[in-house]
């Protein structure tokens, strides 16, 4: 995991932390840092792919591309704020070629997405597939797709016992986490209330990110003082409702040290609530 400054690295990427992990400038055995740089340099070549008479859009990012097809070239101009916004527009500029296919990747996490050509409905892209738009193109044709990037909770397979009663927060393709810097109560003691998530753009935070906010129960664990185990139901915890803030997981550990957690507790257990 690379820092936002681009010069500090993790060799492991924990999904929960008590505030002890800090990125390092270098390692005695440092194969991962240069591989990160290599991957970043390679990403532009992963955005598009081509066949003899088809162009595949694999990744969504504001970009321009010139693609050689049988019979001519096509230039593509992609406009989007993805992953913060699910709207993607691709302007097509054919040069010497008229009929070919433009295939859009529909992410597996998304709901079915409406596809439009020049403002008119063309079809619906099903998650986990490529949606084909084949036609005779003209200069300035625009294909538009809107993917549902709204915040959601994701659960693990029941055999992943350490995540029982927990969920991860997702916004579009990004996994989120709760970091202490954004939350008043200990993030390890927060139980997120399902159905309360909302997204909020913060241009002043971590280089500009969408945060996910919602309601949580802040658990008072003081009744467990001096106990590691107790008969089921004997210890009664109190809780109060608070607001939590989650940030993209890639952006954690770029501020002061503090606890972090990605798989958050869900507010479904029986606890008393206090004002």
Where are each of the predicted segments found?
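Extracellular and analogous surface-interaction loops
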Residues: 90-98
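Short strand-turn-strand beta-turns centered on an Asx-Gly dipeptide
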Residues: 116-124, 172
């Amino acid at each position: 995991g690379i820092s936002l400054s681009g010069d500090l690295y993790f060799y492991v990427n924990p999904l929960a932390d008590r505030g002890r992990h800090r990125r390092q400038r270098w390692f005695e055995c440092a194969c991962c840092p240069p591989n990160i740089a290599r991957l970043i340099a390679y990403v532009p070549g992963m955005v598009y792919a081509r066949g003899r008479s088809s162009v595949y859009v694999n990744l969504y990012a504001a970009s321009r591309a010139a693609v050689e097809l049988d019979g001519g070239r096509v230039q593509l101009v992609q406009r989007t704020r993805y992953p913060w916004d699910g709207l993607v527009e691709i302007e097509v500029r054919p040069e010497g070629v008229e009929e070919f296919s433009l295939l859009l990747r529909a992410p597996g996490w998304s709901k079915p997405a409406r596809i439009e050509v020049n403002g008119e409905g063309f079809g619906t892209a099903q998650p986990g597939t490529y949606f084909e738009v084949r036609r005779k193109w003209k200069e300035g044709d625009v294909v538009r797709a809107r993917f549902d990037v709204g915040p959601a909770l994701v659960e693990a397979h029941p055999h992943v016992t350490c995540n029982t009663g927990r969920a991860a927060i997702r916004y579009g393709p990004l996994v989120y986490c709760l970091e202490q810097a954004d939350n008043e109560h200990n993030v390890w003691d927060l139980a997120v209330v399902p159905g309360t998530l909302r997204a909020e753009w913060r241009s002043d935070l971590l280089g500009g990110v969408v945060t996910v906010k919602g309601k949580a129960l802040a658990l008072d664990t003081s009744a467990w003082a001096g106990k590691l185990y107790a008969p089921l139901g004997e210890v009664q915890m109190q809780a109060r409702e608070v607001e939590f803030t989650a940030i993209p997981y890639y952006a954690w550990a770029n501020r002061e040290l503090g606890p972090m957690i990605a798989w958050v507790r869900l507010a479904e257990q029986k606890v008393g609530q206090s004002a």
